[in-house]
């Protein structure tokens, strides 16, 4: 319902975010430092976010594909890296059970409806804390000043 209510009232689920300023401050952990996040609220100036960061036991920047999974039911939204494998790790969970339309801070008010999927590769701005294009380390001579994201496939399953 983005066209009808706008952001953040439409709700936003960031399944995987990497490149956070916190990861850059711990260079030996940067390749495994990530988070999921949910954003909601009635307006820009009353925007709420829950997106704790974590460090995985394995790197997602090892040149291999990784299975990133979201499970979303009536109670929780959960995000996993390497789902269904020996190295599976849950890195995000938010409780969306409660619904109370008299309280616009309640996350459950915004996550009980269909969503659409966007893939976004950002290399500067608020999240990494980089404002000067010359300081963006993701763009360099080694990669011909190009940032790339490779997605092998996307599957969506839904209960009837």
Regions picked out by a protein language model, each given a short descriptive name:
Residues 1-160:
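GH16 jelly-roll
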């Amino acid at each position: 319902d983005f066209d009808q209510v706008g952001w953040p009232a439409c709700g936003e689920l960031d399944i995987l975010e990497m490149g956070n300023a916190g990861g850059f401050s711990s260079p030996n952990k940067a390749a495994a430092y990530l988070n999921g996040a949910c954003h909601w609220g009635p307006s820009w100036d009353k925007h709420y976010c829950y997106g704790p960061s974590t460090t995985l036991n394995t790197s997602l920047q090892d040149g291999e594909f990784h299975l990133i999974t979201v499970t979303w039911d009536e109670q929780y939204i959960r995000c996993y890296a390497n789902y269904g494998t020996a190295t599976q790790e849950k890195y995000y969970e938010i409780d969306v059970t409660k619904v109370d339309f008299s309280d616009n801070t309640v996350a459950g008010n915004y996550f009980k409806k269909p969503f659409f999927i966007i893939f976004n590769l950002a290399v500067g701005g608020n999240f990494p804390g980089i404002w000067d294009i010359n300081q963006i380390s993701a763009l360099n001579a080694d990669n011909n000043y190009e940032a790339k994201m490779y997605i092998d496939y996307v599957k969506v399953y839904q209960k009837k």
